[in-house]
């Protein structure tokens, strides 16, 4: 099972599991296809969108654990 951190790049996250995209879109991260977002960390993206990065990482890791089980 993959585990991500605040320093994981959005592009890397989407390579780990593309099924995480709807989770990100539902919280307002609509720029997943933007070239610049691919080089942004989860923490940077969370901060731009006013989201707690630690909570987001926990939510993503919970999702990955279930999706990749």
Task: Locate each region found by the language model.
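Domain-level signature for proteins that mediate thiol-based redox and metal-cofactor handling
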Residues: 1-69
């Amino acid at each position: 099972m993959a585990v991500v951190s605040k320093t994981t790049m959005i592009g890397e996250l989407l390579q780990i599991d593309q099924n995480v995209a709807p989770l990100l879109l539902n919280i307002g991260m609509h720029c997943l296809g933007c070239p610049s977002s691919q080089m942004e960390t989860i923490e940077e993206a969370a901060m731009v969108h006013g989201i707690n990065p630690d909570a987001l990482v926990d939510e993503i890791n919970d999702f990955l654990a279930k999706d990749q089980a």
